[in-house]
């Protein structure tokens, strides 16, 4: 991880330098656990304390899929998606991950016993998957929560109508 941080802080690192960096097998992330989804059962919303359900875990680095980028997250925020996820309201996000996991072999990797939260980020691209043309290793990026596949014509005029649009880090795993 130190090599990644050194490259990010360097004024001289080029895209090829970032692409050549060794990637760790795991990283630290804020998660909620599937076996704790009932921990707040019977409590009013105001009595649910996110500090009880949020964990700082070492998690395996996920396989990079087509159209995806691996980003070294330098900043993220707590927003309503993070709070909802942490108190399992209005429903547990694990139901979204299970449903998404049934769509394809690639999306199956999202259905895990933990959920890495975060629906926005600022960071530096380390790797890109097949089909990513606008970004390259070393690019500084920000990301927001909307993930749109645009495989259906329903979303071509209005991405909010895409039946496959999801909120990244809320309805998908591997958040920021």
Positions of the model-derived regions?
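Short, Lys/Arg- and Gly-enriched loop/turn segments at beta-strand edges
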Residues: 81, 148-159
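Short structural boundary motif marking the start of a folded domain
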Residues: 23-30
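Short, compositionally biased
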Residues: 154-172, 176
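Internal, charge-rich low-complexity segments
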Residues: 36-42, 85-99
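A short N-terminal beta-strand-loop micro-motif at the entrance of redox/enzyme domains
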Residues: 4-23, 37-75, 114-116, 131
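Residue-level signal for short segments within beta-strands and strand-turn junctions
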Residues: 31-33, 87, 125
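Short, P/G- and charge-enriched loop/turn segments at secondary-structure junctions
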Residues: 15-18, 108-113, 164-171
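Glycine-rich beta-strand-centered segment in the early N-terminal region that forms part
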Residues: 60-77, 91-152, 173
């Amino acid at each position: 991880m130190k090599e990644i941080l050194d490259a990010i802080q360097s004024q001289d690192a080029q895209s090829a330098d970032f692409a050549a960096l060794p990637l760790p097998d795991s990283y630290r992330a804020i998660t909620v656990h599937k076996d704790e989804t009932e921990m707040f059962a019977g409590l009013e919303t105001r009595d649910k304390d996110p500090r009880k359900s949020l964990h700082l875990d070492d998690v395996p680095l996920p396989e990079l899929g087509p159209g995806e980028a691996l980003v070294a997250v330098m900043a993220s925020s707590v927003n309503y998606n993070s709070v909802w996820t942490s108190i399992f309201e209005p429903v547990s996000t694990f139901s979204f991950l299970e449903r998404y996991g049934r769509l394809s072999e690639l999306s199956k990797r999202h259905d895990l016993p933990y959920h890495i939260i975060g629906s926005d980020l600022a960071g530096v691209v380390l790797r890109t998957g097949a089909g990513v043309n606008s970004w390259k290793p070393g690019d500084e990026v920000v990301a927001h929560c909307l993930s749109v596949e645009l495989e259906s014509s329903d979303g071509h005029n209005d991405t909010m109508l895409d039946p496959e649009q999801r909120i990244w880090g809320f309805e998908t795993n591997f958040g920021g």
